[in-house]
């Protein structure tokens, strides 16, 4: 009877040892507690970088060459001088993930454990993950703001005179020794042609779409002649992109103000490094405090000496972040650009106590996406 009991206890003990080994397929350690002789890899937690894609309109105004004679056409509110000014059309707010080198850990794992990481060393998945795509990659960390990218339209050559530019566009009929009075007569002739087209006085038979096209062409020519008096306004679209890596505020409930770029209607967009006296466009980061309870729990765990000693010796399953939801807003005059973003570094660092057989992380935020038994 005793032999049977001993064998039963031995089998039970072996089962416990076996299950313990299975449960220890992988473990994570802080760098100061990492075992030097163990097989493993270093991984970093994900942090969030905010991306601001800015669309700016560059408005170039040209004074008409006959602006002083605009009274001949009864025009008002004409452009009285050449000039350039800028206005912000749109700001798109988005995010991307980068590796947080200040929060790096060591992961030990056995040969049967499959570990997938991004190019920059952020964990994507652990365990036997089937068809797990690794297309989403953390972008390598870099300091500072990206230099603004502008479209090719920023460098536009301007013709020497207003009239020459319109002639080159084919919008004016060449008239020798053009004067304001001659331009007015040209407008009158073109309007008479439009009347002839509408009344059917033009020789020949034309389809409706041909008549419409001819009328619109004359309209465009009339507008060009009128522009010689009223002036012309050319609008170009310039595109910029800025990135900011915000740091978690000491008091989460307080809004964080982050400079993005400098802007003025006279000079347009400049980077923050620009030394000129220009207003700074600022983003307001308002935390929704969604990780408040997690922060309290982690604070309690950090004060548990027995738990901390156990973690130091045996490690944990894996460290990861619970991202915080943050309202990112930019106010520019009467325009408000806003979006709610998951910012990883504003959230809470935590860990799994054990080693689940399968675990998948969100490549953009580092949050737990799936956890198996």
Predicted regions and their residues:
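N-terminal amphipathic/basic membrane-interacting segments and domains
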Residues: 24-373
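Bacterial N-terminal signal peptides that target proteins for export
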Residues: 1-10
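Short, linear, compositionally biased motifs with a strong N-terminal bias
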Residues: 14-15
